[in-house]
Amino acid sequence: IKDMKKMNIEASLFGLMYKLKSQKSLADKYSRIMKRQNVTLNEATKLVKDGIRFTIVFPKEKYVDGVLNVWSQLLKNDFNSITRKGKDEIRWDVGDGYQGINTLISNDNDTSIEIQFHTKNSIKYKDKLLHPLYEKLRKNCDEKLSLKEMEEKLKKSNINPKCISYKKDLIRAEKKIPIPERIKKCKSLKKKNNRINDLKSCQFIT
């Protein structure tokens, strides 16, 4: 944050009181993973990578410069891998109650932290609008299912119709969030032999 301020890039940390997942939150997540993937508790704990998380917020017009600066600083220090949570490429997420860039940062010891990158608008909508809708969906349905998958299950009477209604509410709410300019996608970043992948390989629109 201090380095970005020196570069005249405005940034702030959001929600530091939630940087560590609570015991209840972790227990709930372990339970969901065990049920969905049919794994043991020990296996489920190894699959959870977001026990520590931070959220960095930028003004919309400074978003891309801010994100690239943070990635560069992390790779110059103790971290060697930046990936999008659960995916092969890093991009602005749309869907499932999330709007922003959500990354996992890892070191040689396979210690990971989650860093979310938001604009002032996207964090406001996430906190006040999307999160309550997502929690309603998560508590009553399988939130990982797409709308299309839910509709297929409904044909077989394998899902509560309310789940589709919750999902549609979430999709409608997401459309209200402005997407920053110059956002497209970026390949996962890794550091090899102390050399950083060229950040220019990130396909941000200029």
Annotate each PLM feature:
Residues 35-202:
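Long beta-strand-rich cores associated with HINT superfamily self-processing modules
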Residues 205-206:
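Low-complexity, intrinsically disordered segments with a bias for serine/threonine
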